[in-house]
Structure formats: C-alpha cells, structure tokens
Amino acid sequence: MAHKKAGGSSRNGRDSEGRRLGVKKFGGEIVVSGNIILRQRGTKYHPGANVGLGKDHTIFATTPGNVKFHKGFRGRMFVSVVAEA
C-alpha cells in the first residue's frame, strides 16, 4: 500500500486585480470635454470649476482647457479645468 493520499490545496494563491485608480491627466495637461482626469474611491479629490463627479467618484472634464490641482477650503484638494486663453 505505497500510495499517496490526496494532498490538501494551499489556502493562499488568490489575489484581486488592480482597479486602475489614480490620476489620468496631470496638472497642466490639456483636456477636452468628457476626458477622465482621475479615478478614485471616495472623494480624496473634490470637483472644482468645469469638472464633474461621477457616481463612482470619477472626476471628469466638462469643458476644454488645462487641468489644475489646488488646495481649498479646510485643506481639501480640488481639481479644476481652466479654459485656455
């Protein structure tokens, strides 16, 4: 009876894929309406002028222009789009 019994499987060996979050367009970059500026979980960055906030807290441009990151009320980080002059 020199047989091997069934070996147990490892409890490890699984990991979720990355969610591709983060800044997609950096400060000073030119964007057009509808461009995604950043993807986030929660509002680490808040929407400023000429940007919208999606239901998954994605910040996107509503008008063409340049991306601007700035601090505002209570130290919050805001993202705006400044129209090109």
UniProtKB/Swiss-Prot annotation:
PROSITE patterns attached to this UniProt entry: RIBOSOMAL_L27
Keywords from UniProt, A to Z, are: Ribonucleoprotein, Ribosomal protein
What Pfam families would the database entry show?
Ribosomal_L27
Name the Gene Ontology molecular function terms of this record: structural constituent of ribosome
TM annotation in the entry: none
InterPro entries reported in the protein's UniProt record: Ribosomal_bL27, Ribosomal_bL27_CS
> How is this protein annotated for GO cellular component?
cytosolic large ribosomal subunit
Source organism superkingdom: Bacteria
Name any Gene Ontology BP term: translation
Q: Region Disordered: start and end of each range? A: 1-21
| Family listed | Belongs to the bacterial ribosomal protein bL27 family.
What name does UniProt use for this protein? Large ribosomal subunit protein bL27
